[in-house]
Amino acid sequence: YLYLMDINILQISNSDCSVMQQSVNIGHEEVHMSYIEFQNVKKIYKMGDVKIKALNGADFSIEKGEFAVIAGASGAGKSTILNLMGGMDTATTGKIIVDKENVSKFSAKKLTTYRRYDIGFVFQFYNLVQNLTVRENVELATQICKNPLDIDEVIEAVGLKDRSSNFPSQLSGGEQQRVAIARALAKNPKLLLCDEPTGALDYNTGKQILKLLQDTCRKRGVTVVVITHNLALTAMGDKVIKVKNGIVDSVTVNENPLPVEQIEW
């Protein structure tokens, strides 16, 4: 139920457009602290006497304003990382730092606040309220946040200005996903977390959605994390984190990420 509730309060951040680095002072030394840090994070699920290690000591970092791609096969641990990062689940051990705060130590109440104000989710399925118009779906999300963006500006930004009075059943799959992204964007949190956001879309529509996400990162300075099984999409990431069997197999910084228009798969 928590998962379904949080799907309906999707958001994005309109944070500072520059990629900012954070640091903390220890004695006379300044030590760099990334915007997001996973430090030896483990997530173990118990099913009777059986323990399933969904994550087994994940370590990586993401800077503010980066477009990060987390890639791996089904069952590798990608969605677990996203759920932990977004406060949808809690780590068994290890630290999860977001914007200098240890999310892994948050109380249930603080996790709820964190999800509402700081995190935006975009999923493979759109989870729109069917009897509300495009504008009403976006407006619904703004009612539970502190500093929402202008609804009409956000709808225009995702290319749905002329569809704002339509209901979800009157929209294509790509248009419905744009509404989900607009709903996220309108809430104005810190992070946009995308779990296979093009999985239910055809090739061309999927490219349009990825371009919208990439533009959101580049033009608004939003930190965007996309998880995918499609390794071709790693070319568009500033940072590529490959996950295999519950561990981080590799982390690559891409000095020249490609626009999604130049990527084929």
Map each language-model feature to its residues.
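Short hydrophobic targeting helices and cationic amphipathic motifs
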Residues: L2-L4
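Cationic, low-complexity basic patches in intrinsically disordered or flexible, solvent-exposed regions
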Residues: Q22-S23
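ABC family nucleotide-binding domain
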Residues: Y35-K242
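Conserved beta-strand-loop-alpha-helix hinge in the C-terminal portion
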Residues: I247-W265
